[in-house]
């Protein structure tokens, strides 16, 4: 890892503290002028209270935030600025888990497009052919094929962390390897 290059790091938060961490990271960006970005996938849910409905924002993945910064800045966020983040470890290298840029871009694109239509699984799905989506809104996304209940899904994997699957017609896919 080079010192000045930015990486995506996967970090855990305490239970129900995702929005507090987001607020702290926003404050560090604006007041402390730290060179960092973050990604917290959220969606809106309408809950029925006694006599009214309430629209609230909830995280798609509980207790998980992605931080884009240099390794030193990522360490400073929790050690110096006391933001309650716990970086996940890569089990093979025993260092902080780094998510590749392409995987992160694909994941953010799919989550921003339709967070309700995405199913997230932390366990590994059926291993299939590597494919690229060539038509539609998801054009350019690279993933693997999974078939569940006779429907075709493209599975996007973030190594050692999670998988996201999106329903895609078979005619939109091209096998790449």
Identify what each model region corresponds to.
Residues 140-148:
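Short beta-strand-centered aromatic/proline hotspots
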């Amino acid at each position: 890892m080079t010192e000045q290059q930015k990486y995506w790091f996967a970090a855990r938060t305490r239970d129900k503290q995702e929005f507090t961490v987001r607020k702290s990271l926003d404050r560090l960006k604006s007041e402390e002028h730290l060179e960092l970005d973050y990604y917290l996938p959220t969606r809106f849910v309408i809950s029925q209270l006694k006599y009214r409905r309430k629209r609230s924002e909830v995280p798609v993945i509980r207790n998980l935030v992605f931080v884009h910064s240099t390794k030193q800045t990522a360490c400073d966020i929790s050690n110096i600025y006391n933001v309650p983040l716990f970086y996940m470890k890569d089990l093979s290298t025993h260092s902080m888990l780094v998510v590749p840029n392409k995987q992160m871009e694909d994941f953010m694109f799919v989550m921003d497009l339709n967070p309700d239509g995405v199913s997230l699984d932390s366990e590994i799905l059926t291993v299939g052919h590597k494919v690229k989506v060539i038509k539609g809104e998801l054009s350019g996304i690279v993933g693997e094929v999974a078939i569940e209940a006779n429907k075709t899904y493209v599975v996007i994997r973030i190594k050692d962390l999670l998988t996201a699957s999106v329903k895609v017609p078979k005619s939109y896919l091209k096998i790449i390897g």
